[in-house]
Amino acid sequence: MPKIDGVTRTLGRLLEHLHSEGHEAIVFGPDTGLKEYLGHPVVGTFGIPILVYPGLKLNFARLRFIRRLQQFRPDVVHFVDPIWLGAQMIPLCKRYLPNVPRVSSYHTNLPTYASLFGVGFLEPAMWSLSRYLHSQCDMVFCPSESTRRMLQSRGIQNIEIWGRGVDTDMFTPEARVV
């Protein structure tokens, strides 16, 4: 994944696991120039840079996303931290893939970030949007019990914990640098 952060690391590890188990996946997201990851196709889309958060863009759904999804015939559609692109894709998936289960994963407390970036007045609206989008999914995954409690306090339901653990190949006592 070109952008390195907690969300892309988690997505990368998920794709590595799916690949190692022989599962197929397709990734839709920002156009980074990446066309595949471990043999999984990556379909990018245009985005407008967010000035207060370098490296992040507001991306737009494309009709070819739905066509590619229909051709791919997924068993499940996973929305990673759905806010902007997820808000566009969830209704399209409900319409064009009505029998395919939808799951989402919660990674970033974006509503709280609004306050940190000086637009705290957006926090209630962002929680409302987040609650609505996650409610359109059959299951919501989050990384910890404390995150689950926070999401439940905000009205988000059907939450399961998807623990991340530690990559013991990368983080070992032998690889320690003093």
Model-assigned labels for residue ranges:
Residues M1-G44:
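N-terminal subdomain of nucleotide-sugar transferases
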Residues D31, S146, G165:
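Carbohydrate-associated surface elements
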Residues G39-R67, F79, G118:
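A short, charged, and often flexible helix/loop element on the N-terminal side
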Residues F65-G86, V100-V103:
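Short N-terminal targeting/anchoring amphipathic segment
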Residues D81, T108, S144-E145:
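Helix N-cap/beta->alpha junction signal
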Residues Y96-R102, I156-Q157:
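A short helix->loop->beta-strand "cap" motif at the edges of active sites that frequently abuts
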Residues P101, L110-Y132, F141-C142, T168-M170, ...:
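Nucleotide-sugar donor phosphate/pyrophosphate-binding loop at the beta->alpha transition
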Residues S135-S144, E160-I161:
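A short beta-strand/loop micro-motif in the catalytic core of glycosyltransferases
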